[in-house]
């Protein structure tokens, strides 16, 4: 049983995405999203919209301990997800769903971060990175104060947050200013409908919106969390292992009791 657990854990995110893609009870759109995510974390993605980055083999260690694609790191990301929507709804922005493709892109891009933060040549349309592991979303939202000051000094910036196009135009035309507030602008983009996040051990957190698949029906954060927790519990076989450990403990107790009984009889 423990060998099977180790084998299932080793497949990491790939096993999770493949299980969803192969489940015919899931919607066609969810299965497509999962299949794309599977190919991305497995290093096999190649389509007219893009292909696996050249650095994949050097940076991604699928399912390995502390890798962003490991079951443990996927679990560590879960508390971050609702924080994104809390930040958005507090600013009258829509709630975002979870795209499995976004999650996959975020995972491999988190893996790219080794010692410093760097936006890799990858499959994202929009990306935030941080080393603040406890409150990554809050670290990006802190740029709001700087943005508000910018708008006071430049009233013409007031319409930047009205559309994705305006945000991109601000990036293209005011790059130095964008570097100071881009994370906040990305999170507040009014046209977003989905996102994903990844975490590399204690090194970096990534937030991504992919550039390869238009996900029309993303999972809610709650639905994704439930889906992952169920898979994780099945993969880790927690119930079976706990039963096994309890049986071993009981057997050991019975053995000790029997040995003590024999000693008492001999005396």
Language-model features: where?
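Long, amphipathic alpha-helical segments that form or neighbor coiled-coils/leucine zippers used
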Residues: 35, 39, 44, 213-246
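Short, well-ordered surface patches within globular domains
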Residues: 3-126, 135, 184, 189-202
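Residue-level detector of solvent-exposed, low-hydrophobicity positions
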Residues: 23-24, 45, 147, 154, ...
């Amino acid at each position: 049983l423990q060998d099977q657990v180790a084998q299932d854990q080793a497949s990491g995110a790939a096993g999770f995405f493949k299980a969803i893609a192969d489940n015919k009870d899931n919607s066609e759109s969810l299965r497509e999203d999962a299949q794309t995510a599977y190919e991305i974390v497995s290093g096999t993605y190649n389509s007219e919209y893009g292909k696996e980055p050249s650095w994949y083999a050097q940076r991604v260690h699928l399912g390995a301990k502390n890798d962003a694609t490991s079951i443990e790191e996927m679990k560590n990301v879960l508390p971050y997800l609702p924080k994104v929507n809390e930040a958005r709804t507090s600013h009258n922005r829509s709630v975002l769903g979870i795209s499995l493709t976004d999650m996959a892109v975020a995972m491999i891009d988190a893996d790219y971060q080794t010692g410093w933060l760097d936006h890799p040549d990858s499959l994202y349309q929009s990306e935030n990175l941080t080393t603040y592991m406890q409150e990554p979303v809050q670290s990006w939202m802190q740029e709001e104060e700087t943005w508000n000051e910018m708008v006071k000094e430049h009233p013409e910036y007031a319409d930047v947050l009205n559309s994705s196009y305006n945000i991109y135009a601000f990036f293209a035309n005011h790059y130095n200013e964008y570097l100071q507030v881009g994370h906040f602008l990305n999170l507040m983009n009014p046209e977003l409908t989905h996102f994903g996040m990844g975490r590399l051990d204690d090194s970096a957190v990534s937030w991504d919106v992919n550039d390869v698949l238009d996900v029309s029906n993303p999972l809610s954060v709650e639905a994704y969390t439930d889906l992952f927790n169920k898979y994780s519990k099945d993969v880790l076989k927690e119930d079976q292992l706990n039963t096994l450990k309890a049986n071993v403990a009981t057997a050991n107790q019975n053995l000790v009791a029997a040995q003590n009984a024999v000693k008492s009889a001999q005396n």
